[in-house]
Amino acid sequence: MKGEREFRRVRQQGVALRDPLFTLRVTDYRPRHGEVWRPQAIIGIVVSKKTLRRAVDRNRARRRVREALRTLPGGLPPCRAILLPNPGVLTVPFPELQAALVRVLAQVPGRVKRKGGGPGGNRRSAPPGSAPLTDDGRLRGEP
């Protein structure tokens, strides 16, 4: 995400999804002014000094979360989000961090609602099957 305006919009209008490892504030995907509609995930990672004192730890937390997001199976749902890691992100094994992200991101398509565009309007919904988990909690595409 770029600029204070986008962060402020997500902070004020976003839905908070909490996990012991992080908090994810998320809103619907809306293209920037003049951009073409290309639904994608735009995620800003914010680590405060209050959460992790040392810059080394803040940077390590950012890198771990960024890599976990990059390597997620099934990709990311289209949204704008702010991810706020907790100190546990540094010590938890990497597969657990990925599993926590999958759990929380699976809730995103159902929790985020687009504003306006009533019946017959210009509403776009998430395509069926866009969540990375099936109804019984398994990753989509696994036996």
Curated annotation (Swiss-Prot):
Catalysed reactions listed for this entry: Endonucleolytic cleavage of RNA, removing 5'-extranucleotides from tRNA precursor
EC numbers for this chain: 3.1.26.5
UniProt-listed NCBIfam families: rnpA
Region (Disordered): 111-143
Database matches in PANTHER family: RIBONUCLEASE P PROTEIN COMPONENT (PTHR33992:SF1)
Gene3D superfamilies: 3.30.230.10
Keywords noted in UniProt: Endonuclease, Hydrolase, Nuclease, RNA-binding, tRNA processing
GO CC field: ribonuclease P complex
Task of the protein: RNaseP catalyzes the removal of the 5'-leader sequence from pre-tRNA to produce the mature 5'-terminus. It can also cleave other RNA substrates such as 4.5S RNA. The protein component plays an auxiliary but essential role in vivo by binding to the 5'-leader sequence and broadening the substrate specificity of the ribozyme.
Pfam families reported for this sequence: Ribonuclease_P
Name of the protein in its database record: Ribonuclease P protein component
Enzyme kind, highest EC tier: hydrolase
GO molecular function: 3'-tRNA processing endoribonuclease activity; ribonuclease P activity; tRNA binding
Family listed: Belongs to the RnpA family.
HAMAP family for this protein: RNase_P
Assembly description: Consists of a catalytic RNA component (M1 or rnpB) and a protein subunit.
InterPro entries: Ribosomal_Su5_D2-typ_SF, Ribsml_uS5_D2-typ_fold_subgr, RNase_P, RNase_P_CS
Protein source organism: Deinococcus geothermalis (strain DSM 11300 / CIP 105573 / AG-3a)
BP term (GO), one: tRNA 5'-leader removal
